[in-house]
């Protein structure tokens, strides 16, 4: 998920470069015949780095494929989506960016909301939380934007580090403001909100808090492992997904559990009997 100003988050593996070799002590100038060895060493290091990256990516994909219930999330960054080209049988849930901070509204939200629902998708909305804005204002922005529908997924609050809002609140103050928004959305929509977050943000800010709030974890290097080992509900395993009908790369997600677990989750939200794309019980 992304803010209105920042590009999408990608974890990148740092690889060594040839520059470190040239920075070593220059006791003597190597002869021309030694240069091919430096080039060869650089090539070997590059191949090793690419191999490690490929290993992590392949294992991450294989791990995500263990979960049968798949979905994706989008915002205006994905442009004009051809919803009729995407199967609600293949992707069981979709989350749309609705709002950010106290006043930003995603310009594609209403269009995506209407068209995705028309195609039979189970749809929910998320809010990108600004750490330097108070929870009440942000909750109001979301409530004014996202319709209250009995067949929509629970609201999501996207919690991650924000370089424009450093040291505005202490951890205790921040948790208090997050609690305000959480409670406002719970009261308005009648559904327990979900927290989308990174491993780093959870381990530093959210650990041991909001224990009844479902977690949606962004982790691109393997299955999420959080401090205290809380159970996660959704896992965003890549931001480099490709779906026919979406003109850009897209975030892909899975639900933790089987098809039957998914049905149970939907039943708890009062959603099971409504959409036509649900699995047969």
Predicted features and spans:
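Functionally critical loop-and-helix segments that line ligand-binding/catalytic clefts
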Residues: 2-6, 10, 16-18, 22-24, ...
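N-terminal Sec-pathway targeting helices
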Residues: 26-47
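Hydrophobic alpha-helical membrane-insertion segments, chiefly the h-region
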Residues: 46-55
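Substrate-binding cleft of extracellular glycoside hydrolase catalytic domains
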Residues: 59, 64-81, 97-180, 186-191
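Sec/Tat-exported extracytoplasmic proteins
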Residues: 90, 98, 117-120, 146-150, ...
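Glycine-rich, charge-decorated loop segments at or immediately adjacent to ligand/cofactor-binding or catalytic sites
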Residues: 135, 201-208
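Aromatic-lined carbohydrate-recognition surfaces of secreted/lumenal glycan-active proteins
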Residues: 190-203
